[in-house]
């Protein structure tokens, strides 16, 4: 195998490993729901939006014939669906959860109808679907910025997950390089905000470490 082939194979494996590691951080929430038989302060929307994101990128991977995208987003969609079902089972507000799920499901079905029925040209469909997935991914990476501002204000990293931060940073970096190797801006560009927010989170962990965070909360009580 040539050096370029080895590098591509290694990069593909890194994308799969780091991204599945990022998705599996939700297993701690799943165990918490099973142990406490409640959802406590666990947020539902990230599970739902990540599932939609996985399904979108899965479709893009199928159209592009990219095995790495297909594997990662198939497993990701299965995991997120599992988290959604567990949340629905333990949530006391089942009506609100079902309403949010049905709304995004309807949007997803409309999107599939548009891309597969109204855009017959394969290349145009691939470009438009890639653009949609890119914009959706960027919005997901940028959505926690308000929480980051609150962390700076309170000097507390309590609401941040260090393992998720590392997994997101590694995943975003590997996908950006992967997209660059494929000359696919729809893969490269949306992962750049993930690298940026990942570095910001690491800086916050360095500036407000868990030990200092605990002392700060004790002083506030």
From Swiss-Prot:
It is found in: Golgi apparatus membrane; Cell membrane. One of its GO terms (cellular component) is Golgi membrane. Gene3D superfamilies: 1.20.1280.290. One of its GO terms (molecular function) is sugar transmembrane transporter activity. It is a multi-pass membrane protein. InterPro entries: SWEET, SWEET_rpt. Residues 149-221 are annotated as: Mediates interaction with TRPV2. It comes from the Eukaryota. The chain crosses the membrane at residues 3-23, 44-63, 68-88, 102-122, 129-149, 160-180, 186-206. Keywords: Cell membrane, Golgi apparatus, Membrane, Repeat, Sugar transport, Transmembrane, Transmembrane helix, Transport. One of its GO terms (biological process) is carbohydrate transport. Residues 10-94, 127-212 form the MtN3/slv domain. PANTHER family: RAG1-ACTIVATING PROTEIN 1, SUGAR TRANSPORTER SWEET1. Belongs to the SWEET sugar transporter family. Mediates sugar transport across membranes. May stimulate V(D)J recombination by the activation of RAG1. Interacts with TRPV2; the interaction probably occurs intracellularly and depends on TRPV2 N-glycosylation. This is Sugar transporter SWEET1. It comes from Rattus norvegicus (Rat). The gene is Slc50a1.
């Amino acid at each position: 195998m040539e050096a370029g082939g080895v590098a591509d194979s290694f990069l593909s494996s890194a994308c799969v490993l780091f991204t599945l590691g990022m998705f599996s951080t939700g297993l701690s929430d799943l165990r918490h729901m099973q142990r406490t038989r409640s959802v406590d302060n666990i947020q539902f929307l990230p599970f739902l939006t990540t599932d939609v994101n996985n399904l979108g990128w899965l479709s893009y991977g199928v159209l592009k014939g990219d095995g790495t995208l297909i594997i990662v987003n198939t497993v990701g969609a299965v995991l997120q669906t599992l988290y959604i079902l567990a949340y629905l089972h333990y949530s006391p507000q089942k009506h609100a959860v079902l309403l949010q799920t049905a709304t995004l499901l309807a949007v997803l079905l409309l999107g599939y109808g548009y891309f597969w029925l109204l855009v017959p040209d394969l290349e145009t469909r691939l470009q438009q679907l890639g653009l949609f997935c890119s914009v959706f991914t960027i919005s997901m990476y940028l959505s926690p910025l308000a929480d980051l501002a609150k962390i700076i204000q309170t000097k507390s990293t309590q609401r941040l997950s260090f393992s998720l931060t590392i997994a997101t940073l590694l995943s975003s970096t590997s996908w950006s390089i992967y997209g660059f190797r494929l000359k696919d801006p729809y893969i490269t560009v949306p992962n750049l905000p993930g690298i940026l927010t990942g570095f910001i989170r690491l800086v916050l962990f360095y500036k407000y470490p868990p030990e200092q965070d605990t002392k700060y909360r004790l002083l506030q009580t």
